Structure formats: structure tokens, C-alpha cells
């Protein structure tokens, strides 16, 4: 279980890093955060509220209308990701979900659902990384007018 969470976290961190930095092309930095990286916030929210609220509290604090919030969960049922997407909806954000074959719980919370048709955790995670790279490449092309 810990390894699965670590890889999902890695996908989020890579996506944020490539948006702030770059994937391939020189361009302006873009605002992006991986909500898993601030251990003080994660620990405080988990202790004071619950682990299921670690993303929702951050989304409430940082998200506004028109922002894009991406939830990544191989199972499609992670309570913390689901609550984070609900909070994003309340804030007026566009919600994107990356998940595996099980979409029943997450589908109603996503404006855009990208579901990998597999129940194999490793394959789902690998595709999530690929989708992050494709997204960053498309963003770079758009910014550069291609």
C-alpha cells in the first residue's frame, strides 16, 4: 500500500515540477502544486481533522474559480482524493481525475475523467506518468503557439 501511494505521489510531483520548470521547451513557469509535498500541512490536517481531509483543506485554501485540480488515484476510491475533488468543485475549479478501471466513485466528481482500463496498479501508474507527460507537452505547444 505504501509503495502504491508513493508512486501516485510521484506522478503528482512530476506533473507539478514539469509545469513549473519545463518538460522539453523553454517557456514561462506555470503555477502548479503537488499537495503531497508539504509534510507539515499533511501532518497537521491529518492530526486535526483526518487523513481523508489532507487534500480538501489545501484545495479550499489555495483554489479559485477557473483553476484546474487534478486528482490521481489508481483505485478511483481514495477518500482523500475524492474529498479534494469535491472541495475543488465547491471552489469553482475544473476537475480532472486520473484513475484505473474502477470509476464509480470518482466519475461524478470529474469534469474530465481519464481512466486506464486496467486493475493492475503498476500499469495504471505507468499510464498516469505518460498522461502527465502528454499534458505537459500539449501545454508547452499551446504556450508556444504551435
Regions found by a protein language model. Give the residues of each.
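Glycine-rich, small/polar surface segments that engage phosphate groups of diverse ligands
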Residues: 1-63
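Short glycine/serine/threonine-rich phosphate/pyrophosphate-binding segments
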Residues: 9-13, 77-84, 106
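Short beta->alpha connector loops at strand-helix junctions that form conserved
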Residues: 36, 73, 99, 114-122
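A charged, well-structured terminal subsegment
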Residues: 61, 122-146
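Short, well-ordered beta-strand core segments
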Residues: 69, 95, 113-114
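Short, glycine/polar-rich helix-capping loops at beta-to-alpha or helix-loop-helix junctions
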Residues: 98-110
Amino acid at each position: 500500500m505504501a509503495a502504491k501511494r508513493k508512486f501516485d505521489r510521484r506522478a503528482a510531483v512530476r506533473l507539478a515540477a514539469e509545469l513549473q520548470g519545463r518538460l522539453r521547451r523553454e517557456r514561462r513557469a506555470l503555477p502548479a502544486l503537488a499537495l503531497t509535498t508539504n509534510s507539515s500541512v499533511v501532518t497537521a490536517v491529518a492530526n486535526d481533522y483526518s487523513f481523508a481531509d489532507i487534500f480538501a483543506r489545501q484545495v479550499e485554501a489555495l483554489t479559485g474559480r477557473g483553476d484546474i485540480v487534478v486528482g490521481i488515484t489508481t483505485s478511483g476510491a481514495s477518500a482523500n482524493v475524492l474529498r479534494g475533488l469535491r472541495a475543488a468543485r465547491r471552489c469553482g475549479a475544473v476537475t480532472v481525475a486520473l484513475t484505473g478501471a474502477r470509476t464509480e466513485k470518482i466519475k461524478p466528481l470529474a469534469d474530465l475523467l481519464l481512466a486506464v482500463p486496467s486493475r493492475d496498479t503498476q500499469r495504471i501508474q505507468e499510464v498516469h506518468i505518460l498522461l502527465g507527460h502528454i499534458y505537459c507537452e500539449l501545454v508547452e505547444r499551446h504556450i508556444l503557439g504551435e
